[in-house]
Curated annotation (Swiss-Prot):
It catalyses: an S-(2-hydroxyacyl)glutathione + H2O = a 2-hydroxy carboxylate + glutathione + H(+). The gene is gloB. Zn(2+) 1 binds at residues 54, 56, 111, 130. The keyword Metal-binding applies. This is Hydroxyacylglutathione hydrolase. Its EC number is 3.1.2.6.
Length: 254
């Protein structure tokens, strides 16, 4: 099985699993249908499964057209009335089998109130939608900042070699903010320089080990990150207080 990011909109990735022997493909968060239909038809593949992480349109917008094209396609997603056409509603603690893959469902609210992620422990793959980005994290919409903080703490506990399949190409912009928070972080500096050598390349998947070294939202226990937060109005150096300031500062960062 091959994993391929199919681009959608300006910066979305639709992560796609391709099994050419079986003649099928599966995808995560198809915000647009056309790129999937084109790819499937050009490779003579049938869409078997759709995995959804949350209700935002740039993640579910293609579902209606895709299930019209492939009516037998299974659609997994969180229990949320804002998402239509989910054939298999799922929640924390359940598992989903996609071909030979067995995904554990992780409940990760914060970005939205019902956000979930798909974790495949045997392969070490995490499909985390908009909860975790490389060097960043999602904004808070209808979830809470406390929930988002807890969701990222959960990701910190995953094995360090876990590959992180984020839904957006935000890495370089996130690194610029990370460099503002930790200007002496050599991992951030080196990664920025690496990306600048191939600025149009896909930076994903990332991995937990890398994120622990570059992502300020996973580094709230580090002294320089705490000092940044305290200098920008944090009530204390407690992890949640630091996280709140980081998220607020990132919201207006340009």
């Amino acid at each position: 099985m091959t994993i391929l990011p199919i681009s959608a909109f300006s910066d979305n990735y639709i992560w796609t699993f391709i099994d050419k022997i079986a003649g099928v493909l599966d995808c995560v968060d198809p915000g647009e249908a056309a790129p999937i239909i084109r790819f499937a038809q050009s490779n003579q593949l049938t869409l078997r499964t759709i995995l959804l992480t949350h209700h935002h349109y740039d993640h579910i917008g293609g579902v209606d057209s895709l299930i019209k094209q492939w009516p037998s396609c299974k659609v997994y997603g969180p229990i949320d009335e804002r998402i239509n056409n989910v054939t298999h509603p799922i929640k924390q603690g359940q598992s989903v089998q996609v071909g030979s893959l067995h995904f554990h469902i992780l409940f990760n609210p914060g970005h939205t109130s019902t956000h979930i992620s798909y974790y495949e422990p045997q392969q070490g793959w995490l499909f985390c939608g908009d909860t975790l980005f490389s060097a960043g994290c999602g904004r808070v919409f209808d979830g809470t900042i406390e929930e988002l903080h807890e969701s990222l703490l959960l990701f910190k506990k995953l094995p360090r070699n876990t590959k992180v399949f984020c839904a957006h190409e935000y890495t370089f912009q996130n690194l610029k903010f990370a460099h503002t928070v930790e200007p002496c972080n050599s991992s951030v500096i080196n990664y920025m320089q690496q990306i600048l050598k191939q600025p149009s390349s896909c930076t994903l998947p990332s991995n937990i080990d890398l994120e622990l070294s570059i992502n300020p939202f996973l580094r709230t226990d580090k002294e320089q990150v705490k000092q940044y937060a305290l200098s920008h109005g944090a009530n204390s150096s407690d992890s949640l207080d630091v996280f709140k300031v980081l998220r607020n500062q990132k919201n207006s960062f340009k």
